[in-house]
Amino acid sequence: MYLISKLYSLDKNINNKKNYSLSKNVIWASPKGFDLAMDIYSPTKEGSSFPVLIMFHGGGFLLRRKYIIENMAQYIASNYDYVVCNVDYRLLRDQKNSVTFDELIGDAFGAVLWIKENIFNYKGNEGSIAVTGDSAGAYISAMIVNSGNKIATSGSFSDHLCITPSYVPESITAEDVKNQNLLDVQAAVLSYGAYNLYSSALKGIFETRKNPFWTLALSKPRGVFGNNFNAQENSEMYKAVSPIYNIPNIDERKLPPQFITSASEDRVTPVHAIEEYVKALKDAGQEVTYWEYKDQRHAYLDSGKTFLSGNDFKRDAIPALKKIMNFLNSKLL
């Protein structure tokens, strides 16, 4: 996968370096001493303010880093006039397998706040931002969209069920973020995500060896909030970080327009589960466009080629990215 990804990076149809400047591994926060970085692609085209696309990678919250969607970032930066931010967040296995699920989501919230404060330095328009991600990254993006108004800057998640961002601008409080809608974005694209951690944990899947990502990550399965909490006795905690339980009715709060995709042959996040989430959004009156990518498997947006699944970025991802960017152009330009 890695070698093919690098080869695709030499293809100017995927990666035309004349069309962007790259700020690589920009450190934007260091929660508990763990450096978090993002790659920022800025258009070389004349202009001072371009829409911003924030990207979060997949990997079951246990695997991968931003490199896995590097071809995607390169393709968008090469072919569209967007500032692209490819963001890393802590995985559950990081910091000696101690990261909690709310901390992971807090990294994503912090990234949005950092980008809004600083993206003007990279030719980005902080008032025209979209979030996107695939698989786990779609889940994270959905949490930003649904729960960006549920934050705290102190106290324990188990007490207040609010997310603490890993980065908050100086002199800004949780109330400021909420009252000024600082985590609001203007559009979202969610690709083959899962949106119900509570259900998976309740069934004894996510936090056990039944979840193969623990084994692949060479990590011991555990509770995602630590060993003192579980889905049976602490359902409110698990529901608080499950997007499907946090969709507001449009009369309460209008969400940004969303483009949600599935893959017809996906066995990791099957079509029926994604359609359930789309239905929940529609039932709440929220704006959503849904597309099922026929004859495709999970992770078709990954860089390079995935030999086990047969995915090929050049063949499979680019048609999907054209649809995604058509949607974003219709909402942000």
Where are these regions (language model features)?
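Alpha/beta-hydrolase superfamily serine-hydrolase fold, recognizing
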Residues: 1-333
